[in-house]
Amino acid sequence: MTPPPPPPPPPGPDPAVDSSTDPCPEPQSLVVLFGATAGALGPDLGSDETDLILLVWQVVEPRSRQVGTLHKSLVRAEAAALSPQCREASGLSADSLARAESLDKVLQQFSQLVSGDVALLGGGPYVLCTDGQQLLRQVLHPEASRKNLVLPDTFFSFYDLRREFHVQHPSTCSARDLTVGTMAQDLGLETDATEDDFGVWEVKTMVAVILHLLEGPNGHLFSKPEVVKQKYETGPCKADVVDNETVVRARGLPWQSSDQDVARFFKGLNIARGGVALCLNAQGRRNGEALIRFEDSEQRDLALQRHKHHMGVRYIEVYKATGEEFVKIAGGTSLEVARFLSREDQVILRLRGLPFSAGPADVLDFLGPECPVTGGVDGLLFVRHPDGRPTGDAFALFACEELAQAALRRHKGMLGKRYIELFRSTAAEVQQVLNRYAASPLLPTLTAPLLPIPFPLAGGTGRDCVRLRGLPYTATIEDILSFLGEAAADIRPHGVHMVLNQQGRPSGDAFIQMMSVERALAAAQRCHKKVMKERYVEVVPCSTEEMSRVLMGGSLSRSGLSPPPCKLPCLSPPTYATFQASPALIPTETTALYPSSALLPAARVPAAATPLAYYPGPATQLYMNYTAYYPSPPVSPTTVGYLTTPPTALASTPTSMLSQPGALVRMQGVPYTAGMKDLLSVFQAYQLAPDDYATLVPVGDPPRTVLQAPKEWVCL
């Protein structure tokens, strides 16, 4: 008995057929699709995160040149409000949308009607065809992701009519600048100008353009559809050079978000393999930022349109980034990391707080048999210091999301006497953490840079300053001067002070020193709550003392002033106790840079006519979050200098051994076993004179001698 023939394949693209390798691929049925949202239209479609309200489609059979029935369906949106642009172009109202079907039911009707039309026309598999990429990439896929809908496979490949038109007519403008009207005009097609049904004219015109392309001299074939990736592919970044036009920076991410959450935020756009790199701060914790690498520049441009779209209740800022920034975060994969990340489709978890004595068997026992690690011991990666000491961190691989969820339930479970934290992680985070501990530089701990000497601020309690709050983070001094308008003429020289946060980024605050109290009050009354770059800015009077406190790291709020962290008792000028008279190894000009206890000899005997060293007074304090001064003619000082001891504090002027400020080098983190030769080898190429060996001064433990190898040195 002969078995019955197999059933015909369902409508949709056949994954077994690779059209890119077939020299003469079988033409597929085309479904011309048009859609609109309740917000922006045209090139900005989907940029405002509004819901889909309309779908119009029609089937075209390329072989017989026949077309099916034109269908139009309204979609009920969660937010019924229509933008003025949409209301004018579509003629729809909130009442008509309220009676429409939901998106999931409309998609079911779409699949049923398209399958019926394709069968009537004698076609087989079909592919969507749209005007541009916004409808699928920026509207349908993101909205389906937000509403937890599963789109049919047919929505993961499509033809961009603009690109297909540009292939046959390359002399026209770029594909990105084409529209349905310009394509019809270039082909000399007559369109129905009386058609006023929104979306119908666009679909009819697109069908006419497609039929004209099919009947062209070369018989244009729609053979290479655009592909939308269904899932994000994890893995190490192996590229040494990354195109600057393919990278964006996402800011404001929830700290617990993973690379899969970031990929879901950019649903519909093709992210390169291993292209999500979550950024870490100096402590190795996530700072709410990520660098994302896309497959091409067009995907990156579409990603920039998702600026201030939402991930849950948080809006995410999206900015341009460079390939160099991405390589710094995601690159530099070692052999150990590459081997660990070589397994694809694995979920990575990070374990933190492990006992230093814990081994692979202890971690596997902690996780338990209900959530096995992929590969057992091979699926664990322990983070260690360069000398082999454990850091208490480890990474584990799990085969699926269910096993990872089971492992996350062990969060803050006990291993020995310590509780263990478990978090979702990414391949880029594995690389960053391992790179942080992979190698130790010759001088591992660098001293903080010396800041320029701040411009002296006049004392007084008069409210002759104004404070600007809520500035855009991109605001410059020129923007502030333009914002103040006529009041900018009353600013004192060097009177504009921008405030940075602890990460060195603008905090949105600034202080302006005015010529008088009256001018400051007038500027505050005139400019309070004026708008700068779509943000209103608060302008309130304040005193110079309040400004100084904030610039030094304190805070100013309605509850009053809080002192900055640097305002400690040791920072005020001490009593002038004299030291033992001895040859000065470190001149008085540089003693203000180091703690006085580190510079004192072991014995202290009162003596006269010796230099006195103390911390700089309030007039020369380091303004830790001060950034820039408003330049006045000729220019503000820009050179970096040292804080010097006031001349009145010197009983006598010793002979300085420093010919210039740059001759002072401080070495921190020197091994206890380091000797004189080890220190001199560091400065081998800097021509340290033999008679200058005595200028190696131990710091930090006065009772030790040079031969006892102190922890810290000052080299002169």
Swiss-Prot record:
Residues 246-342, 347-427, 464-544 form the RRM domain. Its main location: nucleus. Residues 1-24 are annotated as: Disordered. InterPro entries: ESRP, Nucleotide-bd_a/b_plait_sf, RBD_domain_sf, RNaseH-like_sf, RNaseH_sf, RRM_dom. The keyword Nucleus applies. Interacts with RBPMS. Belongs to the ESRP family. This is Epithelial splicing regulatory protein 2. It comes from Rattus norvegicus (Rat). The gene is Esrp2.
